[in-house]
């Protein structure tokens, strides 16, 4: 329908010309009086004029001062937009109502995002912690494991009359993160088992190896070690695995603590954001209250100045009236004196005239 279409510039110009000639009334006679077709009903013309074309209506977004004023007035009057628009110059009730709806939707969306937003845990934050811990752990293992393995090898070699030969040559640990501590950042979560020292008794190796001269102080301690059983072998083979299990437990506890720390940090960040939002709203409210109080004070001062002007005007009028009355009285007295002097002069003139007439008559009567 035509009523639902956007207004064109020609239609707006037609409405302005109609209002200049006939005033903002009788909108159903626009087409008839202007001799131009306008497919709009009277209500649409009235709304268009009142909300968009009326002189003095501001266009564009609300300023920060107007926003604070609208927030304060909405808290005071509720959704009575006509009453609010009467206190916000240049803004219509329809415009303020639409702005308030958009403002409330934005606030609700921000609250939902701040309450329900869950940030993914960034595993890269733990890399430095795990790396430093792994380096420290590897240094400790590099000092403990070779000594234990060497002691176990010497004990087993002296008890069996030959040498123990491992399947692989024991190398000092690499100072970087071992593979069983490394975690995949791609999400595969493949964890390697911790390294352990494995000793084997190989007959071919023992037969092929050349006998070495026995060490006297080791031969003295050999019966005691034989009575205690294969303690050196158990020490060399079990100690790394036990330490590896305790390290894995400690690592799991460390990761759990880091996660709890991250969750606490996230909760603190959310709380800080919400507190900042509440503080911002409180600042807006205080700013609006300050603006309102300033405006009320200015209105009060203007009212007092107006009363003083009225009092001054009345005082000046009173003084002017008294002066006018005094002037009128002086003029009346002066006129009375003039009239009295004129009457005296007239009476004297009449008396003189009569005297002259008498004298002239006497002279004529004499021979």
Swiss-Prot record:
Entry domain remark: A C-terminal domain (252-356) is required for dimerization.
Subunit: Homodimer. Heterodimer with LBD6. Interacts with LBD6/AS2, HIRA, a probable histone chaperone, and RIK, a predicted RNA binding protein. Part of the AS1 repressor complex composed of AS1, LBD6/AS2 and HDA6. Interacts with CO.
Induction cue: Circadian-regulation with an afternoon peak in long days and with a broad night peak in short days. Expression of AS1 in stem cells of the shoot apical meristem is prevented by SHOOT MERISTEMLESS (STM). Expression is activated by GTE6 during leaf morphogenesis.
Gene Ontology terms describing biological process: asymmetric cell division; defense response to bacterium; defense response to fungus; flower development; leaf formation; leaf morphogenesis; negative regulation of DNA-templated transcription; polarity specification of adaxial/abaxial axis
PROSITE patterns: HTH_MYB (PS51294)
Tissue expression from the record: Expressed in roots, stems, leaves, flowers, siliques and in lateral organ promordia. Found in the inner domain between the adaxial and abaxial domains of leaves. Expressed in the phloem tissues of leaves, cotyledons, hypocotyls, and roots.
Domain HTH myb-type: from-to ranges: 1-53, 54-108
Alphabetical keyword list: Coiled coil, DNA-binding, Flowering, Nucleus, Repeat, Repressor, Stress response, Transcription, Transcription regulation
Record-level GO cellular component terms: condensed chromosome; nucleolus; nucleus
Pfam family, any one: Myb_DNA-bind_6
A GO MF label: transcription cis-regulatory region binding
Protein name stated in the entry: Transcription factor AS1
Segments of the chain annotated as binding DNA: 27-53, 81-104
Location within or outside the cell: Nucleus
Residue stretches in coiled coil: 260-344
Superkingdom classification of source: Eukaryota
Null mutant phenotype: Plants with double mutations in this protein and in RH10 or AS2 protein have abaxialized filamentous and trumpet-like leaves at high temperatures. In double mutants, shapes of epidermal cells of the filamentous leaves are simple and rectangular, similar to those of a petiole, but different from those of flat leaves of wild-type plants.
Function of the molecule: Transcription factor required for normal cell differentiation. Positively regulates LATERAL ORGAN BOUNDARIES (LOB) within the shoot apex, and the class III HD-ZIP genes REV, PHB, and PHV. Interacts directly with ASYMMETRIC LEAVES 2 (LBD6/AS2) to repress the knox homeobox genes BP/KNAT1, KNAT2, and KNAT6 and the abaxial determinants ARF3/ETT, KAN2 and YAB5. May act in parallel with the RDR6-SGS3-AGO7 pathway, an endogenous RNA silencing pathway, to regulate the leaf morphogenesis. Binds directly to KNAT1, KNAT2, and KNATM chromatin, regulating leaf development.
Organism from which the protein derives: Arabidopsis thaliana (Mouse-ear cress)
Gene name of the encoded protein: AS1
InterPro entries: Homeodomain-like_sf, Leaf_Dev_Regulator, Myb_dom, SANT/Myb
């Amino acid at each position: 329908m035509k009523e639902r279409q956007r207004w064109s510039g020609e239609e707006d110009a037609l409405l302005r010309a109609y209002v200049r000639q006939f005033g903002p009334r009788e909108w159903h006679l626009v087409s008839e009086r202007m001799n131009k077709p306008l497919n709009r009903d009277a209500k649409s013309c009235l709304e268009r004029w009142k909300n968009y074309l009326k002189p003095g209506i501001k266009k564009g977004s609300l300023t920060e001062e107007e926003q604070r004023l609208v927030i304060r007035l909405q808290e005071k009057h509720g959704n009575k937009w006509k009453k609010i628009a009467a206190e916000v110059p240049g803004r219509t009730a329809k415009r303020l109502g639409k702005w308030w709806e958009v403002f409330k939707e934005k606030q609700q969306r921000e609250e939902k995002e701040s309450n329900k937003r869950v940030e993914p845990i960034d595993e890269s934050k733990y890399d430095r912690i795990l790396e430093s811990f792994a380096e420290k752990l590897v240094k400790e293992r590099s000092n403990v494991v070779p000594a234990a393995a060497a002691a176990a090898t010497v004990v087993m070699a002296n008890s069996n009359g030959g040498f123990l030969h491992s399947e692989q040559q024991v190398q000092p640990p690499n100072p970087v993160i071992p593979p069983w501590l490394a975690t995949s950042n791609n999400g595969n979560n493949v964890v390697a088992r911790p390294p352990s020292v494995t000793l084997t008794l190989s007959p071919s190796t023992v037969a092929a190896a050349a006998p070495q001269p026995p060490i006297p102080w080791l031969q003295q301690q050999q019966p005691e070690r034989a009575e205690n059983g294969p303690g050196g072998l158990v020490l060399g083979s079990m100690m790394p695995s036990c330490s590896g299990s305790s390290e894995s437990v400690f690592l799991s506890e460390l990761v759990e603590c880091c996660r709890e720390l991250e969750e606490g940090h996230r909760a603190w960040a959310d709380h800080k954001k919400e507190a900042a939002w509440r503080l911002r709203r409180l600042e807006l409210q205080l700013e609006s209250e300050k603006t309102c109080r300033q405006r009320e004070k200015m209105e009060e001062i203007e009212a007092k100045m107006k009363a003083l002007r009225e009092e001054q005007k009345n005082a000046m009028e009173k003084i002017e009236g008294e002066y006018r009355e005094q002037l009128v009285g002086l003029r009346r007295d002066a006129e009375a004196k003039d009239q009295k002097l004129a009457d005296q002069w007239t009476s004297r003139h009449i008396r003189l005239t009569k005297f002259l007439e008498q004298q002239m008559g006497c002279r004529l009567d004499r021979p």
